[in-house]
Amino acid sequence: DIPPEMNSTFSMLRLPPFPEIPEPFRGGFWARVCLAWTGDTEAGEKLLAPLREAAPVVIDTVEEMDYAAVDRIYLDPQDPLPARESCTLLRELTPRAVDAFLDQAGPAAGAGDYPLLMVEIRHMGGALARPADVEDAVCARDAEYLLEAVGVLAAPPMAEAVEHATR
């Protein structure tokens, strides 16, 4: 169970060998965990400790920050990219769904010509699941997770592959 003060994502990244991407990430396959925590610092550190121990950590950017700086959590590119994104909401994350995620986005999926830059599962729930005090346009508050796939539309054959993969 994740407290409502935490937002978390798990991503599979296949980064292109572009010079703009810093080493050691350039041209590699990476698993990424991103977190935002709005609670007590000590409680957040306790929740984070098992993640830090679960696997080798290449970069740890967890820090206290102002709300205006939260865009740094994902380390996304600051310049626009020609990309296509597809998202779907999941009410639950079953073992079967995790297996499908790993089959389709994990290290063994389509090595070399894999069209997607990132496939991510984002935990929703928490405060987002609570009904608003006033009427709003937020739907599907019962969705616990968001599944997102992103591909860069680099050249026509890759653009077609990304188009197909994000359907």
Predicted feature residues:
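Soluble FAD-dependent oxygen oxidases
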Residues: 1-167
